[in-house]
Regions:
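A short, Lys/Arg-rich alpha-helix, primarily the initiator
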Residues: 1-15
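Residues within the helices of the helix-turn-helix
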Residues: 7, 18, 47
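DNA major-groove recognition helix of helix-turn-helix
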Residues: 10, 24, 35, 61
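Short alpha-helical DNA-recognition segment
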Residues: 14-33
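Residue-level signal for the short linker/turn that defines the boundary of a DNA-recognition helix
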Residues: 14-15, 41-44
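DNA major-groove recognition helix of helix-turn-helix/homeodomain DNA-binding modules
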Residues: 44-59
């Protein structure tokens, strides 16, 4: 079960996990773990990711069609 949509949003925007890791100040391995749903980011990190990617935090956790 996918708990977040970080990887999908990155792909839709054409943004690499490496770029996000640098902007977020986290290692590539940590961002990859978030993107692959091996580790779930805290709410604070999700909010930071949403701000960096310029998306609503809801878009990182649910599909617009599911709302």
């Amino acid at each position: 079960m996918k708990l977040n949509r970080i990887k999908l949003i990155l792909e839709e925007k054409g943004i690499s996990q490496t770029w996000l890791s640098k902007r977020l100040g986290k290692s590539y391995g940590m961002v990859n773990a978030y993107a692959c749903n091996r580790i779930q980011p805290s709410l604070d990190i999700l909010l930071q990711i949403a701000e960096i990617l310029q998306v609503d935090v809801k878009d990182l956790i649910t599909d617009k069609n599911e709302r």
